[in-house]
Amino acid sequence: MALTSEQKKEILSSYGLHATDTGSPEAQIALLTKRIADLTEHLKVHKHDHHSRRGLLLLVGRRRRLIKYLSLIDVQRYRSLIERLGLRR
């Protein structure tokens, strides 16, 4: 299920650089993390949904590239975000 606009606003307000921030790496990574978590729960129930599994792999790859970009431009912001989201690195 897609994220509702209320869920997006909540995530963006807590992870964005300002209230209307949608383009910073932190905001994008936080939104992707929520979508990945939702899709992972879906796949636990629907094990044979291979189309959604491919979508999940694409989202994980996109998040990985954004995380790598953030680590290259600002290591402190990268470490802070990884800790806040609870991702392993």
Curated annotation (Swiss-Prot):
SMART domains: Ribosomal_S15 (SM01387). It comes from the Bacteria. One of its GO terms (cellular component) is cytosolic small ribosomal subunit. GO terms for molecular function: rRNA binding; structural constituent of ribosome. GO terms for biological process: translation. Belongs to the universal ribosomal protein uS15 family. One of the primary rRNA binding proteins, it binds directly to 16S rRNA where it helps nucleate assembly of the platform of the 30S subunit by binding and bridging several RNA helices of the 16S rRNA. Forms an intersubunit bridge (bridge B4) with the 23S rRNA of the 50S subunit in the ribosome. Part of the 30S ribosomal subunit. Forms a bridge to the 50S subunit in the 70S ribosome, contacting the 23S rRNA. This is Small ribosomal subunit protein uS15. The lineage of its organism: Bacteria, Bacillati, Actinomycetota, Actinomycetes, Mycobacteriales. The gene is rpsO.
